[in-house]
């Protein structure tokens, strides 16, 4: 077989066509960055009994990320944000997110501002090294009143702005009730 321009073009076209129909996994690719963690709510009884021992066991199992499910009185599981971050760091754990419920009581409608309690919640999340503040629940009265829910959606957006000031994002942990049509024929997501 002699090399000719015609053979070169034909073979190049065949090679290009072969690459297009080849399975995508035959080429080397970077390893996927799967950030699998554990929501500490799933081990809440253990965290309540002994948070340090529980975190140590989770780290030994191989978890690298945790999501808190208990924050009260400016503490995560009884520890200040700085103390809790130090504990996590000691076990090689990170806490990119956590559940802290934004409730009606956290918004002062007269002042059009958050209460100090919610401001501290966001500040403490940043101190603990979080990237996301997740509200885990909606007040019952919001789940049955369409106008109240629409109005509170604005508060959610303002919480996003507050979190953004600390380099974080705000989110909501949904459930099945957000898809029901109990808000004057509307769902929460409408």
Model-identified regions with their sequence ranges:
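Hydrophobic faces of well-ordered beta-strands that scaffold small-molecule active sites
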Residues: 34-39, 66-68, 95-100, 133-135, ...
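Acidic (Asp/Glu)-rich catalytic clusters
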Residues: 31, 55-60, 77-97, 117-129, ...
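N-terminal secretory signal peptides and thylakoid transit peptides that target proteins
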Residues: 1-16
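Active-site acidic/histidine proton-transfer and metal-coordination neighborhood
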Residues: 13-14, 20, 107-190
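Active-site mouth loops of central-metabolism enzymes
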Residues: 37-49, 101-115, 145
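Active-site beta-loop-alpha junctions enriched in small/polar residues
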Residues: 41-43, 69-73, 100-103, 138-140, ...
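C-terminal segment of N-terminal export signals and the immediately downstream linker at the start
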Residues: 24-53, 57
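Hydrophobic alpha-helical segments of integral membrane proteins
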Residues: 20-22, 41, 96
């Amino acid at each position: 077989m002699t090399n000719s321009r015609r053979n070169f073009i034909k073979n190049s076209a065949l090679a290009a066509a072969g690459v297009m129909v080849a399975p995508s996994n035959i080429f080397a690719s970077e390893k996927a960055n799967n950030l699998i963690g554990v929501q500490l709510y799933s081990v809440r009884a253990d965290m309540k009994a002994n948070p340090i021992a529980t975190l140590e066991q989770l780290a030994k199992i191989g978890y690298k990320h945790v999501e808190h499910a208990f924050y009260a009185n400016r503490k995560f599981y009884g520890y200040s944000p700085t103390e809790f971050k130090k504990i996590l760091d000691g076990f090689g754990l990170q806490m990119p997110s956590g559940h802290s419920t934004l409730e009606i009581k956290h918004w002062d409608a007269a002042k059009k501002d958050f209460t100090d309690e919610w401001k501290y919640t966001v500040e403490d999340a940043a101190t603990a090294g979080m990237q996301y503040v997740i509200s885990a629940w909606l007040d019952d009265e919001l789940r049955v009143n369409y106008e109240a829910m629409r109005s509170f959606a604005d508060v959610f957006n303002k919480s996003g702005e507050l979190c953004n000031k600390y380099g974080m994002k705000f989110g909501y942990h949904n459930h099945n009730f957000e898809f029901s049509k109990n808000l004057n024929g509307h769902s929460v997501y409408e």
